[in-house]
Every structure is written in C-alpha cells, then in structure tokens.
Amino acid sequence: MNNLILIAAPGAGKGTLSNDLLEKYDYVHISTGDLLREQVAKGDDLGKKIHEFQVAGKLVPSEIVYEALEKKLSDKACDNGYILDGFPRNIEQAEEYERILERSGRELGIVIVLDIPKEDLIKRITGRFTCKDCGEIHNIYSEELKPVKEGVCNKCGGELTQRKDDNLESFEVRYQTYLESTAPLIDYYKEKGVLHVIDSSQGHDYTLEQAEKLISN
C-alpha cells in the first residue's frame, strides 16, 4: 500500500503521471476540488456548509477542507493507496495533513518531486496544443508530439487549439506561486526522509518507470 504526494511545477507532467498510476495501481484520486464537490453531493451537514461558501463565491476555509479530507481518508477504498492532487500546497497544510493521518491511522507514504528546468517547462506550456475533436495533446517544441501539419491533429485531423492560460505571462504567475508556496515542501519532506526526486525532463516514459520503481520498493 502506498499513499503518494506528487509535487511539481506547472507543466512538469504531474497530471499525466497521476492518471497513469491511478490506472495501473487502482489508487484513489483525491483532489481538493473533487473532494468538496463530492461532499456537497452527499448533502450532509458538512456538504451544506461547503455549499454555502461556494454559493457566496467565497473560498472554503481550510478547516472545512481538512474535515472533508479526514472523512475521505476514513473510506476503506483508500486502504489500497491514494494519490493526493494539489494538496498540501504549503507547510501549514502539510503539518495539518500529518495530524489527520495520525488520527486516521494512515501512513505518510512517499513524496515524489518531478524536477525539470524552467526553460523546459516554458516550452511544455507555451508549445502545448490540444485537438478540439479527440483531445490529443501536441507540442510544437517536441519532435515526438509536434503536429505534422500546423494546426492539424496528427491523430484525427481535427483542429488544434491552445488554452488561454498556456502563455508565458500566465506561466510566470503560476510558477512564482509554486516557488513561494509549494517548493518549500521539498525541504520539509526531505528532512522527513520520504522525498524522492525524478528528473522528468527525461520524458514521460522514464518518469513513469522511476515512479513505479519507487512504489514497488
């Protein structure tokens, strides 16, 4: 059984790796967004509290997010392992998460950091295009993913589009947020002896292979 935390800057491939691991190991995927939506759908007291904040257009307080997470971890489906997506985002959340684990009788597991140079991240973000029809992802800076014909999907011939926030300005904002809030978690988990760094600039296949080795150890 493994509980995983994935730490990565925007564009490092965290989402792709997470999806592949979920498919292979039948882990539970836990993201704060899905967690809150799931709780609202249940319609219990906690779900009603969350809904009130959402309707008012306010951020859901951390204490309520923690409560929802603790409820989720009590689910037997998590016994086989789970991947935390987008949490914790800072030291405060990491410390509270460990208190939740202690109360839930679960282990911290392993923390995987996807390491990649900033210039490579920029190319991954600004060069990324997605097919409107089949969802296939292309990248104009990648020999493997580059569209043969400009603006046309290699897989189905559909039109390629780019997300509005896949630009340098948006990337810099997200990257700075990562450096200020999330990156300090690297030293935090390194001191706890649970941190593992993968050079994800080597490509997705290499990244997945290394992650699988960590899980099997």
Question: Which ranges hold each PLM region?
Answer:
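Glycine-rich phosphate-binding loop of ATP-dependent small-molecule kinases
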Residues: 1-217
